[in-house]
């Protein structure tokens, strides 16, 4: 399978050839601006995907555990204005890892429980700050959904 992609854009010409001799190896050739820059690597398609995802990861994320109270700054676009809206609550679940890592944050708003799922590496998440550490003995805190008032509080942890 041979894929050739040629693109010319403002004095920049890029030629990309990917030759797949077997299912697991690929050859990558790149030429830029008259200089020949050739990079040949033998990467499987899954390794190419992992490399792309590694570039998309955010570098500065705090350690977040289930039970922690966090403040998430969410980018909101209203018309042509963009602002950051804080959302504070208890982390009741963590899922996956890598680029698709998510947390579920629960808070009480006007007497009603509201849960939001945030992708940690999404560009919509502007900031993430741990307000206090929680001491829990479960991986998922879905039982907090059934509790009301002071029963929804999580004990504070001081050793992390």
Swiss-Prot record:
InterPro entries: Ribosomal_bL19, Ribosomal_bL19_CS, Ribosomal_bL19_sf, Translation_prot_SH3-like_sf. GO terms for molecular function: structural constituent of ribosome. One of its GO terms (cellular component) is cytosolic large ribosomal subunit. Transmembrane segments: none annotated. Keywords: Ribonucleoprotein, Ribosomal protein. It comes from the Bacteria. GO terms for biological process: translation. Belongs to the bacterial ribosomal protein bL19 family. NCBIfam families: rplS_bact. This protein is located at the 30S-50S ribosomal subunit interface and may play a role in the structure and function of the aminoacyl-tRNA binding site. This is Large ribosomal subunit protein bL19. It comes from Prochlorococcus marinus subsp. pastoris (strain CCMP1986 / NIES-2087 / MED4). The gene is rplS.
């Amino acid at each position: 399978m041979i894929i050739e992609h040629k693109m010319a854009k403002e004095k920049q010409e890029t030629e990309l050839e990917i030759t797949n001799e077997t299912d697991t190896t690929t050859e990558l050739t790149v030429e830029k601006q008259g200089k020949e820059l050739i990079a040949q690597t033998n990467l499987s398609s899954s390794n190419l995907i992992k490399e792309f995802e590694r570039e998309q990861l955010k570098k500065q994320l705090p350690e977040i555990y289930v039970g922690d109270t966090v403040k998430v700054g969410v980018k909101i676009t209203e018309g042509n204005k963009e602002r950051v809206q804080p959302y504070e609550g208890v982390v009741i679940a963590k899922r996956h890892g890598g680029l698709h890592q998510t947390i579920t944050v629960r808070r009480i708003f006007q007497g009603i429980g509201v849960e939001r799922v945030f992708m940690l590496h999404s560009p919509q998440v502007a900031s993430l700050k741990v307000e206090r550490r929680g001491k829990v003995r479960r991986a998922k805190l879905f039982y907090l959904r059934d509790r009301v008032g002071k029963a929804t509080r999580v004990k504070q942890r001081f050793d992390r």
